[in-house]
């Protein structure tokens, strides 16, 4: 049974368990520390999840947690794919009386994957990730989520001449949310790709329709702080390079950072001043290149290293360290499910001339195929 068949089996079973994702989350609340997500914040997450189908529990979902903020807030993320129950839910909503901007954007994107733009599917496959601003939103007005594509079918290594594929992914995201195409924005994103070292890869493309326009890029695989600095200098990133290099050097002194990822915001005017740093300490990659979860990382050394940063909340670091666990068996009406959970990544945020934020990203995913 391949990964898509396993997801389909799990979705069929979840559909018999309930209707919306909030019903599933209600059963999982006991495993999430109140230091990470408070009760009032949890209710806001549930309000969002009530608009999503329970079948999305068969693909990774989880939370973005601000480790620098004592308030127990969280943003929410979930995954779906064209051609299965989760994607069909949004297509049906777009055709029906409950159509909304999000379902229409998803339907337009899936139409490109399935028929209109086969080149897109050859790069990113047929999955999509959504990121909902909840804890970070001022008013929680139900605005559109961020939409993210990952090039899982074709790895976009630097130096491989794949700038056309980069443009294909950008075009798809821009058009699906109804933005006007901007040639200079597209060229700027391709310029970032062309500046990548050969052994780095373009890991994801994202847009946030409810924020100021930009293309969010994730680039993984930088080996040293010096390599990061040189890359950012080539692109004329408008921040303080010494702050970036110093932050990575401090972490290297406390623990062995094997690779580093970067998050950049790219627009028609060039690169934005906010930069995300994703240190990776030790990783085992998944056997299936189409896996929804890249691999298993030993995050504890990095969490221990972050304790040395005075602005990081110690209680949240402790709670995050407790999050990684072995597979858990859940018992439901249709039988057993296996739940996998863990830390997906940790990101440090540099804004211009200072390191000011740390965020933890945790995931959960259920399988009803492993348990039958």
Which role fits each region the language model picked out?
Residues 31-34, 52-55, 116, 176, ...:
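Surface-exposed polar/charged interaction patches
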Residues 80-108, 157-178, 223-243, 289-308, ...:
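Extended intrinsically disordered, low-complexity coil regions enriched in Ser, Thr, Gly, Ala
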Residues 74-81, 143-154, 212-225, 274-283, ...:
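Extracellular/lumenal glycan-associated surfaces
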Residues 69, 140-142, 208-213, 217, ...:
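Edge/loop elements at the starts and ends of beta-strands within beta-rich repeat scaffolds
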Residues 35-67, 119-133, 194-206, 261, ...:
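Short, compositionally biased low-complexity segments enriched in polar/charged residues
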Residues 108-158, 162-224, 228-241:
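Extended, well-ordered protein cores
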Residues 2-129:
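An N-terminal, globular interaction/scaffold subdomain
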Residues 224-372:
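C-terminal structured domains
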